Amino acid sequence: MKTPRSVVASITSQLSQAGLISLLTLSSLGALYAAPLPSSFGVWDRGEAMDPKIYPYLRGTTCDSPWNEVEKADGVYDWSILDKSLERAQRENLSLYLSFEAGPKTPNWVYTKGVPKVLTEGGKKADSFPFYPYYLSPVYKTYYHRFLFAMANHIKSYPKEVQQRISFIQVKTGCTGDECPYKGDAVDEKYSLTTKGAEWRAFRLETFALYNKLFGKASGLNISLLLSNVEPETEDGKADFVEEWKWATANLQDGFGIKNGALSRGHHLSGERSSMTMFLPYLVDAKGLTLFRRSEMDQTWTRPLYQLNVPLNFYWGAINALNSGQSVWDVTKSAVEQSKAQGFDYSFYFFNKYAGQIYPATATHAFCALHKGLDAADVVAYPEAEFGKAAHGNLERMEKIRAVYGKYGAANDDKKALKLGQVGQRGDQAGFNDVGWNIWPDNYSRLLYQIAPDETSIPLWRVGGPITPTSPIYSRFARGFEAASAKNALYFRLHEGFSADASPKVMTLTVVWYDGVAGSTWKLDYDIGAPTMKTALTVTGSGDKKWHHEVVTVKDAVFRHGGTKGSDFALINTDHKDDVFSLVEVNRGGQELPALRPPTDVRPVGGFAKGTKYNSDKSKKGGK
């Protein structure tokens, strides 16, 4: 059944009067957005109504109000999903982000109006949904736009204090949040649309402009948007979503959100380096355009690699995400529920502590997690003439790189996984690899950096021996002294602006170190604005083979890079024995109590120990 032209014309007239037709022509207006407050950055649940009294690290939640649930009948709206979510957010003092999924969640009645029903075949998830709308159908766009217009009006009906619970809206133009038109390929070629194609791009940009008009500053709601598949040209010349990036940066000039699911789901994942470097200047101490970043933890944590040591993997996943400037970490229900029993809720508190530390002048905390990733894609660090051709599948090159650092603990436990992309690694990798392809090569940090790490210290992996299910979280990566090669100091420098002037300040420093040698000694020196650094702490080891937290508060810290090598403070070897360090933290003021510490007793919980590979999971769905 086709919709009469008079009906389409009537609806189109209504939308046109509201200024919602041909919105791309309005892009020159450049709507401005108020980005979510950094105080809302941290761990969120994925809309599963987890109780923040039981899980106090939760700072927010999500609400998807899919079109087929809201408008089950033509023009009849059921707002109960959204109403209940906002009521809960207000009651429990949570932030909330929204999405309004359409695409395969288009109401069935829309197809009776003349919208073509698209069937798909092929692809990994072609059976995810039975059918899809043809997005370019004028009838589809007419009713879809009407739905979004009604959604905006309903949000405007809430009191201001309720509206302010909404941190951002994730724009979903196609399937779920993946931003593809279909899972698989259209059976009928005349309905074919591809994720990187011009027709799909035009539809997305039109939808972006619609959201901009309906929910942005000009609408009075002033809600930020989060966009997927939006990025500048990459270092290797890829320009798949550059037009989307250009539109967003021209029209959402006060900032917007981006999605990157992988960075909080693990470490040493293929492609993570490019993903970090591309956006980090817009996320931490941004100059001009400011972005925020959302990522999620799905069922990756139940897969083999994570299950080798769950607390350790969650910790380094959190560290990896913070290093990339991540703002919001959506965590699946199963992980939230198991977090305390399995001892990895520490990682959520740690993430919360640092997620909002994005402006050095106002930041209260900074950290540097000591690490070296052996990136086989780096031909400067590992020349092809010495290590072989730089190709993702060149395992011989990867093994040659690893061999250089084998004496420091570097190993590749699952060589097959070295060839995989990050999705395959998250699902099927069954061992820790210290070499990778396009992985992060340096320390992980937020506003605190080590100076010349390889010149003054050595990298270390698997401190204390092979990683087991009960190994301490810090044992995965570290750096240390090597007296035999005259590497006897680790120098650190805070981000410019963290210490604004030369006046004395109260600062607390925390050093996590491994006590591996009885009688070993080291000290912490810091910048007081004098020609020589001052000693704040001296430590003597007992050799107990355990990780320790040393905490010292100083009241005369200047931290204006006046120490040795332009440092603010340094860890100095005071004998010929070698000490090992994993984490260094700085916070303004005195020590915070109770101190945030990881559990000392890690016990694997029955039923979660082995993990399930993607290729042995018939559904192949991560789920929630």
What feature does the model see in each segment?
Residues 388-497:
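Glycan-recognition and processing domains
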Residues 101, 254-433:
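Substrate-binding cleft of secreted/luminal carbohydrate-active enzymes
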Residues 519-531:
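Short, surface-exposed beta-strand/strand-loop-strand elements in extracellular ectodomains
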Residues 170, 177-181, 196, 205-208, ...:
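Substrate-binding cleft/loops of secretory-pathway carbohydrate-active enzymes
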Residues 570-577:
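Short beta-strand-plus-loop segments that form exposed binding edges in beta-rich domains
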Residues 90, 128-168, 203, 207-210:
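An active-site-proximal structural segment forming one wall of the substrate-binding cleft
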Residues 531-563:
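Extracellular carbohydrate recognition and processing domains
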